[in-house]
């Protein structure tokens, strides 16, 4: 284990808890990395960078992979860029600032692994926008699809939580 990366991860976990920044936790973290391993990714696309925690995990696990990660919030984007520089990953983890709907049009594929971690209501639209840029055997992971058990519930799901 790299002590610099371990310290960065711990720092981000504390920061996320303090500032209420959603980051992947516990069992979901293991599921994400297991799903990505199935793709043996050379290129990864993450939609929803936040402060860069998931990108850091993916860059650490896949040291040869190029990663494009998209974030709409300028403060979180700046923090993610800072994290990638501190980790020594800024040459292969590219943090893009802007709305995913616009940024997806500018990206070049193919991507072997897609991680949807932005607004749940946009997942289908984002998937359709990037579908042609995925490699034939790409693996797709979507965070929060079981958000608060709503997928399993018989109750109507509020629009903003639909995927």
Model region roles, listed by residue range:
Residues 61-62, 107-108, 134, 138:
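A generic alpha-to-beta junction signature in SAM-dependent methyltransferases
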Residues 105-114:
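A short acidic, Gly/Pro-enriched loop at the edge of an enzyme's catalytic core
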Residues 118-120:
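Switch II (G3) loop of P-loop NTPases
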């Amino acid at each position: 284990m790299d002590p610099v990366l371990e310290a960065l991860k711990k720092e981000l976990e504390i920061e996320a808890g303090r500032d209420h920044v959603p980051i992947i936790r516990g069992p979901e973290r293991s599921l994400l990395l297991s799903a990505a391993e199935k793709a043996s990714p050379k290129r990864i696309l993450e939609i929803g960078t936040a402060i860069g925690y998931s990108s850091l995990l993916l860059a650490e696990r896949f040291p040869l992979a190029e990663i494009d990660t998209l974030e709409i919030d300028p403060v979180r984007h700046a923090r993610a860029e800072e994290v990638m520089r501190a980790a020594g990953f800024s040459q292969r983890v590219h943090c893009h600032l802007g709305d995913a709907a616009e940024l997806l049009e500018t990206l070049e594929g193919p991507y072997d692994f897609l991680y949807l971690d932005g607004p749940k209501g946009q997942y289908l639209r984002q998937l359709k926008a990037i579908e042609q840029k995925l490699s034939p055997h790409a693996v797709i992971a979507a965070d929060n699809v079981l958000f608060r058990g709503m997928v399993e519930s018989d109750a109507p799901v509020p629009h903003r939580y639909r995927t």
